[in-house]
Amino acid sequence: MDHKEVVLLLLLFLKSGLGDSLDDYVNTQGAFLFSLSRKQVAARSVEECAAKCEAETNFICRAFQYHSKDQQCVVMAENSKTSPIARMRDVVLFEKRIYLSECKTGNGKNYRGTTSKTKSGVICQKWSVSSPHIPKYSPEKFPLAGLEENYCRNPDNDEKGPWCYTTDPETRFDYCDIPECEDECMHCSGEHYEGKISKTMSGIECQSWGSQSPHAHGYLPSKFPNKNLKMNYCRNPDGEPRPWCFTTDPNKRWEFCDIPRCTTPPPTSGPTYQCLKGRGENYRGTVSVTASGHTCQRWSAQSPHKHNRTPENFPCKNLEENYCRNPDGETAPWCYTTDSEVRWDYCKIPSCGSSTTSTEYLDAPVPPEQTPVAQDCYRGNGESYRGTSSTTITGRKCQSWVSMTPHRHEKTPGNFPNAGLTMNYCRNPDADKSPWCYTTDPRVRWEYCNLKKCSETEQQVTNFPAIAQVPSVEDLSEDCMFGNGKRYRGKRATTVAGVPCQEWAAQEPHRHSIFTPETNPRAGLEKNYCRNPDGDDNGPWCYTTNPQKLFDYCDVPQCVTSSFDCGKPKVEPKKCPARVVGGCVSIPHSWPWQISLRHRYGGHFCGGTLISPEWVLTAKHCLEKSSSPSSYKVILGAHEEYHLGEGVQEIDVSKLFKEPSEADIALLKLSSPAIITDKVIPACLPTPNYVVADRTACYITGWGETKGTYGAGLLKEARLPVIENKVCNRYEYLGGKVSPNELCAGHLAGGIDSCQGDSGGPLVCFEKDKYILQGVTSWGLGCALPNKPGVYVRVSRFVTWIEEIMRRN
């Protein structure tokens, strides 16, 4: 592995769109293509490399690779459809969309796919041969028509679309059955529509998916890389009947778009099943009774329940009779019921047996087995690491090792039986520098994992409150790094493999021009010291003195601060997906920010969250009985509600602040700072106005009502998916009652929810390497009822108010 992840400059360039010259390419970071027909050329930029691909005359250039460190460009005749891909550092693979596509636009004159059969199923004749038919159109006569192999083409601009000469002597030519691309029309419900329509049915301009104004939303392009949420184009990321968008009208949150249906049959959707596989989206069995015993309503009927999940709106979902189906990406097949009191329910479908655990079948972007935050590290190069981390250094989620989506690969448990390739956990099957994984982002093939190297001695726990440190000028000279080490100015000068570094000013054994003391005078490129001039996520590196290896990373440890890390428990949470109502007892002290709010001389009545040593966040409605701070006290570090054990802290409330608007949120100032211990650690506050992505897996905790089930009196936890407000406000759920200052979370089937006594408590979401407080438990229609998810105050909307109150007091 002689290359490295792409430099920050290139990453920023990629994120900005790369410009018009690269719009016709699909790019994948960290992917290396094995191509027999290739040419290596010099190029100062990605665009220059693309221009050389377009100008290539010795072969048809279908792809190119750009190596940023040595400004190397490789143009190639093959692409990922015809040649294998490996992972590599410091490379981005660009493939022409036209050669990856198996659909046609218009009459298909530019179709360059690999279909090689006619509509009637006859194999096509090669364009370069003269038997059984002498061709009028050949590669020699029409070199720009893409007449390769025996693939269907349209060299004469035939209005009926691509065709080919046939291998049947009795039939000279016939047309091919090529589906239309979803750029000017849509198949099915438009789940794969990729066009550029950006106005709603009533003519309102669409809001950009990357914008949170005028409407905040949870469909973030970075969290849904498979949904193609580009610009402000109409899309269908959530299983609606057709594409839609948020609008630029502050008074109209969202609206459907007017996309015409394609006239050709849709592409095949893969195998169908008579049993449950994954989420059951391809289930085509005849079960027509829900798990609770209700008979299903016919999909074509509007009684007793009116709905838009009709055969007309979902023509590809086989909504026949009253059979259980999953047309909209729910967690399992379901149906509307014939009981007017029960709108819908899930069905109990027998499993196919060997159900997959691949990431493509998870019901949320965040896998349930999340990266540990407590005491998870690797030794050596991490080949022996068998932890459960599944997050990369940039915060991306790992792809399951048994999955081939979105990245096909050969690092499978069968090929590497001793590498511990379990679930989507970070591993090092090929003796790389540290554990890594393939990512669930189609644009990034793989990344190193967000793991640290084990230290010789354990870090001590601070017993006094502190403020998170910012590295000072003195810190820069220490032989350790903060963050990605861009400001590291230590004197390490060997790579992780022990090879001495080449001096930055030298041109031997490796010539380079991008990272020199002259081009980067502020990057500290002195002598041959390890540095990170490009802000590489993987840390400091250097060119090596090994002529066979251009560069490698250095083994620079993270600096240890005396401050606590918010959102990082010392005890790893269970992260159990079971219910709070019904009981899933947490591991003691694994949610160390959870507090019990009590009356001065009474018991627990509400929850809350420690956000700094002196401050607790809770729900405003918890303080309705008294506005006097002296009426309340806070219990920290507890696991049992009634029997407070060793290490529990009991602190009075000195001040309370209720958010001045209608929001159900309040701040409590403690009479003395909490002592930060293994059992008492604050949660992190979110970025102001941050919106949690739809279906993000988050966690609620509390000592609330459990309806007499197991675990009463012990701190419980549950994993809940966030539900986008657009969905939560549907008539069948909460009917427009949820405001932009609130968020929904829960399982629509019911059974898992916060309840009485959990009010004011935390809803925390895992982000990269810590838990962030995104919600304050506020209200709900009953406890754990079907179709009635819990509602939480959206903390990010009040961060500015929170910080201002804390600063003034």
Swiss-Prot record:
Disulfide bonds join 49-73, 53-61, 103-181, 124-164, 152-176, 185-262, 188-316, 206-245, 234-257, 275-352, 296-335, 324-347, 377-454, 398-437, 426-449, 480-559, 501-542, 530-554, 566-684, 576-584, 606-622, 698-765, 728-744, 755-783. GO terms for biological process: blood coagulation; fibrinolysis; proteolysis; tissue remodeling. GO terms for cellular component: extracellular space. Residues 103-181, 185-262, 275-352, 377-454, 480-559 form the Kringle domain. Residues 1-19 form the signal peptide. Interacts with CSPG4 and AMOT. Interacts (via the Kringle domains) with HRG; the interaction tethers PLG to the cell surface and enhances its activation. Interacts (via Kringle 4 domain) with ADA; the interaction stimulates PLG activation when in complex with DPP4. Angiostatin: Interacts with ATP5F1A; the interaction inhibits most of the angiogenic effects of angiostatin. This is Plasminogen. It comes from Sus scrofa (Pig).
